Amino acid sequence: AATTFPKPECVYQAMDEIARTGAVNAGRGSYALARQASGLIESTRKQIKELAGADDVAEVVFTASATLACNVILGGLEWKQTDIVYVSPFEHNAMMRVLYHYQKQYGFKIIELALNRESLELDLSQIRFQFTREHPTVVVMSHVSNVTGYILPINEVAESAKQYGAVVAVDGSQALGLVPVKLKESGIDFYVFAGHKTLYGPFGVGGFISEGDISLKPFLVGGTGSDSLNLDMPGQMPGILEPGSPNIVAIAGLHAALEACCDMERQLSQERKFAEYLIEKLKRIDGVLLYLPWDEMKRTGIVSFSIEGYRADEVGMLLDEDYHIAVRTGYQCVPLIHKYLKDEKYGGVIRVGIGRFTKQSELEILINAIEEIAEG
């Protein structure tokens, strides 16, 4: 799956230790453990900023998940009926359902960024033309597709969007910790991350980096541990967007995962090597259809395919029950891309997620299993 599992051992150890010895409410007391918890949170913010190449003055906002982060960002913008919102065809419902919710409320227009239907890559020249015809107000795009593994050209799209003063939000859930990124001076205003994916941290923590100077109105309100006599939310970032008790156990796990973060270029190269090996083997199996961007240097370790004569969920069950192999099947919570893949008759795709701990021997078992299933 594109969710990473298992985690580095240090993640489990850090979460267990703090759950037993320091799971207190950060920012809600002056005693030593509360100060230590606050220090851990601030240290983790710094790690995230450094990993993402963000500006020193950028803010890191923690949430319970990337989905909630998308809600905080999109729910914090001031929408108008005249807004023009561009989205990539690769967007997860963590973004798309939120956008659709506000579109129904405000009536703004949503346009898909142009896609080359053959290469399954964004068409930058056509996107620039789209922007000249209908100027973007907001541009939303994933950094990496959780269906095809495609690495989107986020810097190039952001540069074009900024010529029209657009707000640019990137969902980096499948990228941060794997694909190098430098947010500083990129034109990207908000960059979402998920602790449990390519960062190799736990569930229960995600968030976003606010790199630009765009202010968001509070999406959620409540206690922050500061200015408690004031019924309005405190005006300072990131507290204005972080009501409620922080999940210090999950943040401790994320902190440990970030400390254990491997060299991203080396890790990405290893995933590509394994993915290319798997792809070449699958190409030789009759009845296997692959869904990939053409350029292997624009892919991560996600490999999606179908098998003629089977629905995706049927293959998933066979792999699980007969071979003890876990894969994700179906539409992967991505509503727009499948009309380009033309995979509806298969009930979506079968997705293999190659990660940090994948072994060559495991790929051989998978390839053998797919050969046997395809043969019937």
Residue spans for each PLM region:
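Pyridoxal 5′-phosphate
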Residues: 1-376
